[in-house]
Amino acid sequence: MSSESPIRIGPAKNEGDLMQVLAIQEVVFIEEQGMSMELESEILDREAFHVLAYNQGHAVGTGRLLVLSEPPPGEQGRWGQVARMAVLRSSRGAGIGKALLETLSNEARKLGLNGLSLHAQASTQSFYEKEGFVVSSEVFYEAGVPHVEMRRGF
């Protein structure tokens, strides 16, 4: 029996991959959470680095990294923003979110970024804290959902 994980993370390289990213985001953010969002324009943002998580060949999670034009207030250097982290309900709890975040963090380091920021839903704050992110804002609302800004330097 192989101990190799059936989970694979890789960049979204083509239109088919980007459509899988969009499908996962629609399920998680719109169907599950009831958000009304304009995902398509974001998915077509070619400046973003999108990743997909596959479990036994099926796309089950996604996230993206954007390089910010300026660092967050109070920070120095070049920073990135992690956004649209989503894992299908049937695949949660298997370490996929952590693997996605690690892949995005590694890409940020390759790009020479000094840190990452993100807007975490209040319900996911503890996940990001376990990954070294620190809350850097009061609670605010995006798409009707409470969020906090979080940051992690490298």
Predicted regions: what they are:
Residues 1-15:
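Conserved N-terminal entry element of GNAT/NAT acetyltransferase domains
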Residues 23-37:
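Helix-loop element at the rim of GNAT/NAT acetyltransferase active sites that forms part
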Residues 41-45:
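Short loop/turn motifs at secondary-structure junctions and domain boundaries
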Residues 52, 58-70, 81-86:
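Conserved beta-strand in the GNAT
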Residues 68-82, 92, 142-144:
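A conserved beta-turn-beta hairpin within the catalytic core of GNAT-like acetyltransferases
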Residues 87, 93-106:
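Conserved acetyl-CoA-binding loop-helix of GNAT-fold acetyltransferases
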Residues 101, 108-121:
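Conserved GNAT acetyl-CoA-binding A-motif
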Residues 117-119, 129, 134-151:
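Conserved catalytic-core motifs of GNAT/GCN5-like acyltransferases
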